Amino acid sequence: MQRIAIIVLFGLLSSGANALGLLDAWELALRNDAQFRAAGFEHAAGQEEETIGRANLLPNLQYGYNANRSHSKVTQTDSFTGNTLKRDYDSYTSTLSLRQPLLDYAAWARYQQGVARTLMADQRFRDRSQDLMVRLYQAWSNALLAQEKLQLLDAQQRAYQEQLALNKRLLLAGEGTLTDVRETEARFTLIEAQRIEQQDNLDAAITDLENMTGTALDITTLYPMMLTQLPSAESGKQTLAQWRDLAVQHNAKLATQREGLAVSRYEIERSRAGHLPTLSLVASSRNSRSESEYNYNQKYDTQSVGLQLNVPLYAGGSVSASMRQAAAEYQQSQAELDDQTKKTLAELKKYYNLYNNGSAKIKAWQMTASSAQEAVNATRLSVAGGERINLDILLAEQDWYNARRELAEAKYSWLQAWLLLRYTAGTLNEKDILELAAWFQPATTSLANNKTIRQ
């Protein structure tokens, strides 16, 4: 597709003091959407997993100090005399200790889990960012589509109102029937009920968009879709097999689950470490005075360094049980990844077909709407000539407005399929939002009418 210059795009989106373009809504959603803000905090927390895991491999340095005031009575007994001494004295102990793991398989496994969890947090946040783009477009398009449907109902209601006025005039002139009046009144009343329902749908859609953007919105300030020229489907650029390869490699949900699988794999290794020895370098510097009755009024200054070896012998079978449990959880994670992969590829195929067939669908509904409009005009002439009846006009108008409604839905669905195809493939980014925003412009702008959208 022709790339739309960003400078031009920003110029288009900035026109109108109170108007709101899709790019403006995106910037607001980045700051105010509660789900995305929560994802940001979740991502920040996940970034610490690697550091926490690495800490188990690094030196552990501790300092301790203990001071006491002691009062004691010492009685010495021998065969001749007994002496009793009373002592009031201060004592302290100061210890600086260092431990450096040299061989600790469990600590290494925990570190690898931390790395995997950090990568998993990155992929999950990437998915949340892409999901925000999808949710924003859905909320945006739902609001505009609801408004468009409401406008179609208003136009249909006006048409029925004019037809009702004509039926009444013909009835008074003796050329019409009461049946014609009642039929048109019934259609008019039905449209009124549908209009009330559609107004509720519009209010709900606007509320969803307001919740995402964090600001009060008026539907009339949103840039409408300017997809008046038939888009060209560029299905030859990338085949379904190429899209499948992209999804397997880049889909954020699959990437998240792959990192989760790595966490499960290292959990097996961490459990296995229960069978293995650990070796640590230990060093300490200790100062004490009058630490106990046995070294009263004596001061010690001791430095030591050495190796500490721990060899597990038997733990009641818990290590083997933990390994079996971790292995089962790993298989569970693998099965869940396989299931998610199949679901992702199925969704990818659906959106691929929706996008590539969307152009033909839009063209078909354009032709249907045009034919339906001609049918309305022809039916009116036939009724005037006595060849058709009033009900035929009502049915023809109903078909026309239904076709226009289906055409509007097809346009929004086509853009949504374009967006979801990229989301499922894992390639969706802010450049796509810029490109998508170019299709929503002030009504006076016609640039988008001459553009096509890349596959």
Provide a role label for each language-model segment:
Residues 18-66, 72, 100, 217, ...:
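Bacterial Sec-pathway N-terminal export signals of envelope proteins
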Residues 131-246, 351-354, 358, 399-401, ...:
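Periplasmic alpha-helical coiled-coil/stalk elements that build and connect Gram-negative outer-membrane
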Residues 86-90, 237, 299-301, 402:
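Short sequence motifs at beta-strands and strand-loop junctions characteristic
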